[in-house]
Amino acid sequence: MPALVLASTSPRRRELLARIGVMPARIAAPEIDETPLKGELPRDYVVRLARGKALAVARAPDEVVLAGDTTVSVGRRILEKPADEPDLRRMLGLLSGRRHHVWSGVCVVGTDGKARVRAVDTIVAFKALSAAEIDAYVASGEGMGKAGGYAIQGRAEAFVRFLSGSHSNVVGLPLFETRALLSSVGIPLG
């Protein structure tokens, strides 16, 4: 039975894996350049990063590597993690009162060395946010370090008026697709 290596230090991804009864044998922090390429579409961006992260982690012959990447997009514009509070404020202003996409790429490299990748898109619509709501959310610090500047599993859930697709995708790892990929390479599921 292969051992699972999670190519992510995200506590949210570990929590999500635990929901499907999966506990990584090892955690590794992949080192790759996450800068979007000029003109790169959000779907292509997350697929490239997920594959790059999975392949960047050293793997023993009996190990399977799982990596993921999530981003938020408004149209073709990719919203990465906010650099600072003004950037977070700008992102929340862009998301206010509109629909956006949350894209995740998930990649599993099996014991055969083959990379298997899936892309998942969830549509989220935020209510119109007041300046006071944006100020309070920025002050909470919750949006820092999160793609698109918000955590749907936290205070920002109250901003969501519509969601179409995978909720776990918005948290950071689409569980349906992840479960299928892990099963396809022999990782036992709970």
Curated annotation (Swiss-Prot):
Q: Where is the signal peptide?
A: none
GO MF annotation terms: dTTP diphosphatase activity; UTP diphosphatase activity
Tell me which residues are marked as the site Important for substrate specificity: R12, T70, Q153
Q: Which InterPro entries match?
A: ITPase-like_fam (IPR029001), Maf-like (IPR003697)
Q: Which GO terms describe its cellular component?
A: cytoplasm
Gene Ontology biological process terms, A to Z: nucleotide metabolic process
Known EC number(s)?
3.6.1.9
Pfam families attached to this UniProt entry: Maf
What does the function comment of this entry state?
Nucleoside triphosphate pyrophosphatase that hydrolyzes dTTP and UTP. May have a dual role in cell division arrest and in preventing the incorporation of modified nucleotides into cellular nucleic acids.
The text of the family note is: Belongs to the Maf family. YhdE subfamily.
Per its UniProt record, what NCBIfam families does this chain match?
maf
UniProt-recorded name of the protein: dTTP/UTP pyrophosphatase
Species per Swiss-Prot/TrEMBL record: Sphingopyxis alaskensis (strain DSM 13593 / LMG 18877 / RB2256)
